[in-house]
Amino acid sequence: MSSKVLKIGQITDIHIGEDENLVQGIDVRKNFLTALNSESMKDIDLLVLSGDLANENAEPGAYRYIAEQLKGVKCPVCIIPGNHDSLDVMVKFFDMPVKNGKCYFRYDLEGRSMFFLDSAIGEVSRDQLDWLEEEVPKVDGEVILFMHHPPCFCGHKFMDLHYHLRNMVEVQQVLSKFKNLKHVFCGHYHSEHQMKFSHIHVHAAPP
């Protein structure tokens, strides 16, 4: 396992619209560019876009705009869909691996292994969990997991009640088996949360 410290940038829930019009009064394109070009994104080893790239209806113009901005990013980029995205549309603009109609994959960088899950429909499919159970034990060293929905409640009453991961218990049962999985990074809640279940720390990033 590499001793190099990886610097990973995560951008989530940018909700880009079809055109330059404001989204609910917010200049989301400007916000995206501000995040993309921020000081914290300098010299990163990997950029992760963790879902809800489009605003409401998987607008092609949103993905086209994002893809154009990503051309200037010098590091690798990993993308997973959120509940407002459409994988069928996204793959027309981004290099995203698709298996069984979902976007889930392992990405190795500098001796580190990162796993990415597709929770766009509000749950993690059984085939993804079976794949994790097969692949994670093969890794000698710590692994990192990215997904759109947090795999636990976050203390946000509205989101926890209405928009939580539907098969959360099933997902937790699988993830808890992996002693080399200590950190999960996600989005979806539009606010920052630090939670923990079992031995796993969950980091929900704000937009």
Where are these regions (language model features)?
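Short, flexible loop segments at the rims of nucleotide/cofactor-binding pockets, characterized by
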Residues: 23-28, 54-58, 93-95, 120-122, ...
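Active-site-proximal beta-strand elements of phosphoester/diester hydrolases
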Residues: 5-18, 111-121, 144-146, 200-206
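Extended active-site neighborhood of metal-dependent phosphoesterases/phosphodiesterases
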Residues: 61-138, 164-180, 195-198, 206
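N-terminal active-site segment of His-dependent metallophosphoesterases
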Residues: 1-65, 138, 154
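Active-site environment of divalent metal-dependent phosphoester hydrolases
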Residues: 16-20, 55-60, 83-90, 122-124, ...
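Short low-complexity stretches enriched in small and charged residues
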Residues: 1-8, 32-39, 68-77, 100-104, ...
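Structural beta-sheet core signal
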Residues: 10, 49, 79-82, 145, ...
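His/acidic metal-ligating clusters that form di-metal
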Residues: 35-47, 124-203
